[in-house]
Amino acid sequence: MDYINKEKAKLVWTQKDWEDKHFEAKKKVLEYPNYSANIDHASNWGKAILKKFSSSFFTVTRLLPEKKKKDVQIIYAAVRYPDEVVDSFNLSKSEKVQILKRFELEFVKSKNYKNIYEMLNNNISLTIAGFRDVCNRYKIPDKYYIAFLDAMKKDIESSVYKDWKDLIDNYIFGSATVVGYFLSYVYGHSKNSSLGECMETSKSLAIALQLTNFARDVSEDSIRGRCYLPKDQKDHKNQIIYNGVINKNIDDIISSKLLLANEAKRWYEKCSNRIDNFTEDSRLAIKACHTLYSKLNNKILKQENNFQRESLSVVEKISIIPKNQYLKLAIALVMNK
């Protein structure tokens, strides 16, 4: 039962792909120093990344108003690249740490410049320049992105979490909760709620989404010598299963998937009635995201004997969209909007 060793994590873009594509995207900005056009270029860069790396999130974000959609795409680029550095780049641990440190220094340095064009002319990447512009416009505190990069650094050296609270407070906060916070600023709060209430809702949803991703990726993570299931969790025989996952034991991997998905289910339920905290024009996309990933999580729970990576079909994804939005979504996908 050790054939999982042969399974390879899917590599979407190599490090060179990232560098080449970034060079071309950056060149477009430098050719035309117009603020509005530069935001569009930064957003298009983010859209290319989002479409390539997450078809599910790409689909639900088509339901956002144009301005918010553009800003979400920029945010996605800023969180996807560091994640790929850690998980996909063929580099030593120290080389990955150095890239993340340089990325953090770029982010801090970017505060010194007025706009995207000026940042690019001072050796700031388009990924960071676009994200800094979003942070400036929405007044997103720098500490959240620093926390995100710190969480990415933790993934370079596998960490052990003693219980759910330890995992949520000391890893998921940086890797997912703060991303939910970024989106809260962009989505905005309704007249009857506050930014703080939106952030609490985003926190619960971010935890749920991250736990679902952990559940789906247990097999791939075990190849990397990584296990996010807390050390205190036990299987139906009351046996600790953490070491079994690290050692690629199929039964323990399946048990881990189910425990993670069950914990995720609790967090989906916690935020399901609080999506109205957000502005009306953002709710459809947020509800679609909640429904889509809940469906994926339930699929993991139902396929109790499957240790492979679950996914939703195109039909399953489209089925979560209200029928009166089919045309809008179809046009957006066909026209690559």
Predicted regions and their residues:
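Catalytic cores of Mg2+-dependent Asp-rich isoprenoid enzymes
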Residues: 1-209, 215, 220-337
